[in-house]
Design a protein with these regions (language model features):
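Alpha-helix capping and helix-coil boundary motifs
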Residues: 12-17, 61, 88, 143
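Low-complexity, serine/threonine/proline-enriched polar segments
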Residues: 26-134
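Acidic, proline/glycine-rich low-complexity IDRs
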Residues: 1-3, 125-168
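Short, extreme N-terminal segment that most often corresponds to the first beta-strand
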Residues: 1-40, 157-168
Length: 168
C-alpha cells in the first residue's frame, strides 16, 4: 500500500528541503516502510525518482502550505473515525480480563480488537506511523502543533513541506 506524507523542514530552498528529507528518511526515521520516493512518487510526474517538484514553500504559498497540513489532519481524523467504529469496547475489555485471569485472550486471539486499539493508541500518542500523513523534522514529531506555533510566531522563514510516497 502507498501513502503520501508531507514532511515539514526548514531549508534554504526547495532542492535543499528535498535533500534534507531524503537524508533523514534514508538514515533513521521510517521503520514501517520498505520503499519510498521523496517528492511525491506516484502523486507526481517523477513516480520513481526523487524530486523537488511538489515541495511547498510557506514563504511562497502560505495558504497552500496550511491547506496541505489541514488535509493531513483531516486524513488522520478520517482514519481515527474508521478505527473508532471498529473498536468494540466490551470485546476489548473481555480480552483484557481473560488475559489478566488466564494469561491468554482465548477465542478472541484472532480478532482485531487489540489491533485497532493499538492503532488508536499509536495515533493518540502521535507516534509517526503510516496513518500520520505528516512529520515535522524540525521538532522530531508527528504533531502539527509545533509548525503552527512557528507560523503564529512569524518564525516561518524557510519552512517547506516535502511530499514523500511511502510503501508499506
Amino acid at each position: 500500500m502507498h501513502t503520501l506524507h508531507w514532511w515539514a523542514v526548514q531549508a534554504v530552498d526547495k532542492e535543499d528541503a528535498a535533500a534534507i528529507v531524503e537524508s533523514v528518511v534514508s538514515e533513521e526515521y521510517v521503520d514501517w516502510s520498505d520503499w519510498y520516493v521523496v517528492g511525491g512518487g506516484r502523486w507526481s510526474n517523477s513516480q520513481y525518482e526523487n524530486s523537488h517538484d511538489m515541495v511547498i514553500s510557506y514563504d511562497e504559498e502560505p495558504e497552500k502550505f496550511k491547506e496541505t497540513i489541514r488535509g493531513c489532519i483531516q486524513a488522520r481524523m478520517d482514519e481515527m473515525t474508521f478505527i473508532k467504529d471498529k473498536i468494540d469496547i466490551n470485546k476489548f475489555v473481555n480480552s483484557v480480563e481473560k488475559y489478566a485471569n488466564f494469561g491468554t485472550i482465548g477465542d478472541d486471539r484472532f480478532g482485531l480488537q487489540t489491533y485497532y486499539v493499538r492503532k488508536a493508541g499509536t495515533m493518540l500518542l502521535e507516534y509517526y506511523n503510516p496513518d500520520s500523513y505528516f512529520y515535522d523534522i524540525i521538532h522530531h514529531s508527528a504533531s502539527t502543533d509545533y509548525i503552527y506555533e512557528l507560523i503564529d510566531k512569524k518564525d516561518s522563514n524557510g519552512l517547506f513541506l516535502v511530499p514523500v510516497d511511502f510503501h508499506y
